[in-house]
């Protein structure tokens, strides 16, 4: 487990905190491996009834650490990001997101796979994939329109419209 992913269990609820505040909680491949392990364990555990995902300090997550991803992926099996996305999208138990600040890119994608999203007033939601020359991952181009409607999803995905917590509450 990387020191940037913190797990705490209390009264059958595990909280996973993305804890890399010096990089606005940008996620590395090692962090994805730790998050995949945690979700896979949760899916199999009878001791835990709910799983909360949150970010440390002022950010939920600023998305992928692009410098880390530019180094390439490991060659041993399924890449950690794919393991994580598979684990979050197929988890048979309740997933709760506690969004304490900006959720960017894959941070929004994560939310689309959660059963409940609780957002602080400081939360914002943005998907700068096109501006970065990337494609939305893990069915976010399907799930975002289903959640916020086609017009808002297109505005978010194609023009990087940022939703604040008050606006997101409408959806």
How would you label these PLM feature ranges?
Residues 1-56, 86:
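Conserved CoA-thioester-binding segment of acyl-CoA-metabolizing enzymes
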Residues 10, 45, 56, 72, ...:
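Structured helix-beta-strand junction loops
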Residues 16, 20, 35, 53, ...:
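Terminal peptide-recognition signature
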Residues 26-29, 62, 71, 131, ...:
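Phosphate-coordinating loops and pocket residues in cytosolic domains that bind phosphorylated ligands
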Residues 31-34, 80, 110:
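Hydrophobic alpha-helical membrane-association signature
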Residues 40, 47, 55-90, 103, ...:
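Glycine- (often His-adjacent) and acidic-residue-rich active-site loop
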Residues 89-171:
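Crotonase-fold acyl-CoA enzyme core
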């Amino acid at each position: 487990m990387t020191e940037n992913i913190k797990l705490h269990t209390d009264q059958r609820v595990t909280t996973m905190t993305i804890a890399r505040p010096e990089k606005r909680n940008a996620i590395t491949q090692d962090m994805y491996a730790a998050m995949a392990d945690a979700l896979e364990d949760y899916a199999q555990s009878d001791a835990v009834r709910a799983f909360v995902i949150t970010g440390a300090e002022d950010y939920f997550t600023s998305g992928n650490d692009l410098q880390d991803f530019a180094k390439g992926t490991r060659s041993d099996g399924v890449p950690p990001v794919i393991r994580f996305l598979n684990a979050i999208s197929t988890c048979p138990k309740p997933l709760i997101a506690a969004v304490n600040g900006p959720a960017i890119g894959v941070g929004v994608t994560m939310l689309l796979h959660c059963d409940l999203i609780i957002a602080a007033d400081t939360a914002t939601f943005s998907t700068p994939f096109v501006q970065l020359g990337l494609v939305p991952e893990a069915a976010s181009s399907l799930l975002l329109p289903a959640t916020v409607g086609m017009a808002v999803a297109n505005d978010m995905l194609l023009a990087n419209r940022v939703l604040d917590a008050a606006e997101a509450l409408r959806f």
